[in-house]
A protein has these predicted regions:
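Gly/Ser/Thr-rich beta-alpha loop segments that engage phosphate groups in nucleotides
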Residues: 9, 24, 70
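Active-site loop-helix segments enriched in His/Asp/Glu that coordinate
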Residues: 47-113
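Histidine-centered catalytic micro-motifs
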Residues: 7-18, 76
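Short, function-defining helix-loop hinge/capping sites that tune catalysis or transport
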Residues: 15, 20-22, 82
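Single, functionally critical "micro-switch" positions that shape active/binding sites
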Residues: 9-13, 42-43, 67
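Active-site gating loops and adjacent loop-to-helix segments of metal-dependent hydrolytic enzymes
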Residues: 19-53, 109-113
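Histidine-rich, glycine-flanked metal-binding segment
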Residues: 1-6
């Protein structure tokens, strides 16, 4: 006998985090959450361009699908590549066959604009 289950839903993902693997270690060891943000995640998200966003979304979606996840809510930030970033994520996920809802993180850490 076999059973089929519906696809899983990941309600909080950062698809660009697929690019964190292989990053050089931070210059200092983070000892708290703020330090982790500053030393790892904010270094990564400020370096993103549209091509990196597209490929990281595709990789993240493929890895999710491989584990049975068919729908993702992606929380994205790329202060250097805002225009078109959510479309790049949506297109990459569609190519893989994963449903996605994209949300752009709003912050003032790069200034009021």
């Amino acid at each position: 006998m076999s059973a089929t289950t519906p696809g899983l839903v990941c309600a909080h993902h950062h698809l660009y985090s697929a690019l964190a693997r292989g990053m050089p270690p931070p210059p200092e060891v983070a000892t708290d959450f703020q330090g982790i943000l500053e030393q790892i995640w904010w270094r990564l998200d400020t370096a993103l361009d549209l091509e990196m966003i597209r490929w990281s979304a595709k990789l993240g979606a493929l890895e999710a699908l491989e584990q049975g996840t068919t729908a993702i809510v992606d929380h994205h930030e790329s202060p250097g590549a805002i225009e078109g970033s959510l479309d790049a994520i949506a297109d990459a996920c569609a190519e893989v066959g994963v449903r996605v809802v994209c949300a752009y993180g709003v912050t003032d850490r790069h200034g009021a604009d």
